[in-house]
Amino acid sequence: MLKKRGGNIVTKKVLIAADSSCDMPEEYIQKHGIKILPFNININNVNYLDRKEITTTQLFEKVEQTHQLPKTSAISPGTYLQFFEKYASEYDIVFIGLGSDFSSSVNSAILASKEFKNVYVVDSLNLSAGSGLLINKAVLLREQGLSALEICEELKNIIPRVRVQFVINTLKYLHMGGRCSGTSRIFGTALKIKPIIKVVDGKMVVAKKPMGYHRGLQALLHMLEEDKDNIDGDLMTITHCLADSDAVYLKEEISKMVDHKNILETNAGAVISTHCGPRCIGILYILKENK
């Protein structure tokens, strides 16, 4: 049996960490001292570290050049073990990972964490900035003086209130990756369907099937409007893959609809873009806690 490592869980500083699928801006990551573990992206049998060795623009340039769809591979237990060993002597660690239905990576993190007394792994049951919203909550809870264990428990209570919905411009990537139930029924249709994908209970599902991209954006706004009186004020994100002008449009429309002071535009990294394709865009937020 492996001996657990790590020190007292009460007196240490809290380190917040995540994988590269969280899609939070580098400026935010640096400001709050977040540690990021990169996924591997494979294109035409060449491996790249997400966020470090390949950008989203470069990803699709390589797809055009090679005519090969990219593949992602989970972060290994050994990589997590090395990371936790590096920081667990100085920090209590809260690690927030890509939802377990989308990758085995977070399960590898859980496996590695079992060797330590002071490493807490959170399965976000989400993706992209949906995980990023949880990172932001963890930062705020750390600022309030909560311990790593307390932060972990609070995040687990928040997870069911995270809302992630995005419009897909091309079904090719999502369908080939087999990541969303229901896409096979509409893939290849002559209609210009741009499905709205939601994350429900940790899984991606097709929520609506608008015809045309602009109608897809309107559907996103309509879904937001239904929640507008119950949105947590800490942070909302507009996350997209090479859809800058659409992000500007959505931010303008959202500002007319809700009085939210913290709307952050984020760019989808290579992990999310690999499965969702160019011009995918979403609105992500957390609902208020029912009192």
Report residues per predicted region:
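N-terminal glycine-rich anion-binding loop in soluble enzyme alpha/beta folds
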Residues: 14-74
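Mixed-charge interfacial surface used for oligomerization/domain docking
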Residues: 4, 9-13, 20-35, 40, ...
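Class I S-adenosyl-L-methionine
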Residues: 47-115
